[in-house]
Amino acid sequence: VIEHRKERKGDSFRNLRIYQDMEKRNEEFLPRDLYYYGRELVSHRLYEKGRQVLQAFLRDREGWKENKIDAARQLAVCCYGLGQEEEALLALLQSFVYDMPRGEICCDLGRHFLDRGRYREAVFWYEQALGLKPERDSGAFIQEECYDFLPAISLGGCYDRLGECDKAEPYNRLAGSFRPDSPCYLQNLEYFKKLWRP
């Protein structure tokens, strides 16, 4: 048996350098180039430059709607990384300009409110995510867990923090139906067992 393996890891900066070289040469960026350059900047935590590039992409009238929606998410990551929480929230909401809400965006909005102790608002967004179906034919980057496990486990956590364990526990069970081996689900399962013990 012959195996072909790479001797070393790939160059994670390769694509970023390509776009940076294009910029140095003053080459014209097509909307698609701006989008992918922005994603590369975000993945390398270059948030200020990423914010600028993604905003330029979102201002451009051209560009595929799925890329616009994801660019709004990536812009939010930049804003969070720069400590601009309100701008991050606005970036997520901007995605609604392009199409119906996606599970990924709803989960991001849920997380925004969860992290700030605003559990009722978080519940709203996680419930929206749980009620959506992924647009598999769209060609978009889909995070399957944003349509089942993530909103379910998060709803369990939100309701627990609200003191509504009668709602929290069923959502944890639902999360377990999606990922029965999840350490988070299993830990919560033990927590609820202890809670309900007489």
Task: Give a label for each model feature.
Residues 1-52:
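Catalytic-site signature of metal-activated, phosphate-bearing donor transferases
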Residues 27-28, 62, 66, 100, ...:
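Short coil turns that delineate tetratricopeptide repeat
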